[in-house]
Amino acid sequence: MRTVRQRWATGWGRALHTSGSAPAGSSAESALLPEMGQLDPKVAAAPRRKYLSAKYRVVGKLFQQAENGGYLAYRKPAALENPYLDVQARPRVDGATGQIVYQGTPRLSVTRLLTKQWCELRTAYDLYSNMPLFESKAMRIGKRAHRKLENKLHGASDAAATQALERLQLAVPVDPLHRLAADWAGAIDRMCTLFQKGEARELLCHGYISADHGAFVEGPVREDSDVLVSGVIDHLVLTQRGGGSPLSALQPERSLQFPSDMAELVPFLKDLGERRAAEWEVVVGDIKTRKYTQVPSQASVVETSRLQVMYYRRFLEDLGADVDKAYEKLLTNAQRRGLDVDAPLAAGSAISVMEGIPQLGADMLRLVRGDPIGFGPFDSYNRYAAHDTYDFTQHAALLQDQPELQKYAVFFGQWKTPFNLRFLAARMAQLYGCIAPLLSNTLLIEYYMGGECFHVNTFKYDAAELRKHCEDSARFWFGKREIEPIEPTIRNVNAYCKFCDYKDICLWRKEAVLGWKSLGEELRGLP
C-alpha cells in the first residue's frame, strides 16, 4: 500500500515517517534549554514567560543537540524535513475508510509564504513549535486599527444585518461552514462597495501553488498537491489611471445609477470596466501599523511587504481571468476546508445576507422560486441536482403581529434552490471578473501610527520577482531546501537578533559571534 505522501503527491513527497509530526505545545516534554529560567524580566511578564517556556520546550526537543551544548541547531529535524506535511497539514490514512485525512491545516496563507520576512530560522522555530504567535500589545493595537478602518467603510452593512437578526430573533451559527459563508458574503459586499464608493477593505483572495515545482497553478486545480494559499487584502482603491495620488478614490455612485439586482449589476460592472479601462484602475495596498512614525529599516521586512501585496494582486488577476475557473477554485477552497458546498445555510445566515447586501435580495427570491440566477455553471448544476428540503416554515411564527417584518414572509417557506456556499461562490467569481481588467501595476504599502497614515510606499508589480519568490518559498515548505538564516554579519545580528525569542539559544547566532571574535584575534596578530 502506498504511503500518505506517495498518494498525496507522487513524485515529490518523501516516505511518511512513523515519527510523524511535531509535538504540540500542550504535550511537550520538559527538555529545558540552557537559558530557561533566565528570561529578561523586562520582556517576560507572566503570560509571555509562560508562553516562551512552553515554546522552548517543544523547539528544544526537536532542535536541541547535545554536541551543540544545548543550543538550537539550524537544520530541519531529521524525519521532519517537509514542514508542510510534517507540521502544517499532518496527513494520515484513515484506517476505516482508507482516505487521507488531515490532523493539521492543509493550506497556507500569503503571510506563511513570507518565510524570510525577519529571519527564516526564527520562522522555522516558530513553525515547528506548533504554537500561535504571542499576541503582543503592538499586535493588538494593529488589529484595532485595521478593524476601525474596516468598520468606517463597511460597518453600515454589518449593522443592518445585526438589526434584522435581532428583530427576527434569529442568529447566525458560528460553525466553520457559516463562518466561511459570512466571509464570502462579506467579500461580495466589499467588491460592490469598491465600484460604488471607490474603495474596499479586507477583501478575501486566494490562489494555489504546486508542491511539485513551486509554481502558481494557473489552470484548473486537479491535484491534492496543488496547495491552497489564502489572503486578505487590506485596501483596494478605484482611482484615476495616471492620477496624482493612488489613494484618491473615485466615487462612481455620485454620478452613476447602479442596478440594485446582482443579476443586472454584474453585466453593468463588466461593461463599465471595459469602457473605463483606459481611465480607471484598481490599486491594491497593504496597511502596516507602527509604534512610531518611522518605516522599517530592515531590507527583508521592506522586501517581503512588497511581495505580500504582489501575491494579492496576482491572486486577484488569476481569479478574474476566467470566471468559470474562479467558481471552481472557490468550491475547491471550501472543500479543502472539509466543508460541503451544497449544505443548506441557516435562516439567520440568509436574512443576514439579504439585509447586509441588498443587491442579493432579488437573488434570494430566485432561489426560493427555483429560478436561474444567470450564471451558467451554477444554473446548470441546480437544474439536475437533487436537493434536500430547504424549508424555513418553522420560522414563520416570528412574523405574527409584526407588520414591519412581513417583507420576510416569502422567505419563510420552502425554497426550491437552497442558499449555500455554491451560490455565494457563483456571485464572488463574477465580481472578481469585474475587478481583474482594471488591476493596476502600481501597488501600495500604507504605514499608520495612531490611526493616521504617515507614509505611503508605492512600487510596481514585478511578476518575475514574485514567481522567483514563490518557487523559493515552496522549496522550503515542501522539503526541497534547508533553512536559510540571515547572513551572519554584525549588522544583521544587531538588527535581527535583538528582538528574537531565540537569541540566547540559537546556534547560528552563537557561531556568528564566535566567528567575529576569532577573526578579531587573527587581525590583531597581523604584523
Swiss-Prot record:
Q: Which InterPro entries match?
A: Exo5, EXOV
Would the keyword Iron-sulfur turn up in this protein's UniProt record?
yes
Q: Where is the transit peptide?
A: 1-23
Q: Name one GO molecular function term.
A: single-stranded DNA 5'-3' DNA exonuclease activity
Name the coenzymes or cofactors required.
Mg(2+); [4Fe-4S] cluster
Q: Looking at the Swiss-Prot or TrEMBL record, what is one Pfam family this protein matches?
A: Exo5
The answer, when asked if Zinc-finger is one of the entry's keywords, is no
Q: What is its EC number?
A: 3.1.-.-
Keywords of this protein's UniProt record, alphabetized? Answer: 4Fe-4S, DNA-binding, Exonuclease, Hydrolase, Iron, Iron-sulfur, Magnesium, Metal-binding, Mitochondrion, Nuclease, Transit peptide
Q: Which domain of life is it from?
A: Eukaryota
GO CC annotations? mitochondrion; nucleus
Positions binding [4Fe-4S] cluster in this chain are C119, C497, C500, C506
Q: Which GO terms describe its biological process?
A: interstrand cross-link repair; mitochondrial genome maintenance
The cofactor note reads: Binds 1 [4Fe-4S] cluster.
The record's subcellular location field reads: Mitochondrion
PANTHER family in the cross-refs: EXONUCLEASE V
How it assembles, according to the record, is: Monomer.
Question: Tell me, what does this protein do in biology?
Answer: Single strand DNA specific 5' exonuclease involved in mitochondrial DNA replication and recombination. Releases dinucleotides as main products of catalysis. Has the capacity to slide across 5'double-stranded DNA or 5'RNA sequences and resumes cutting two nucleotides downstream of the double-stranded-to-single-stranded junction or RNA-to-DNA junction, respectively.
* Family membership noted in the UniProt record: Belongs to the EXO5 family.
Protein name listed in UniProt: Exonuclease V, mitochondrial
Gene transcribed to yield this protein: EXO5
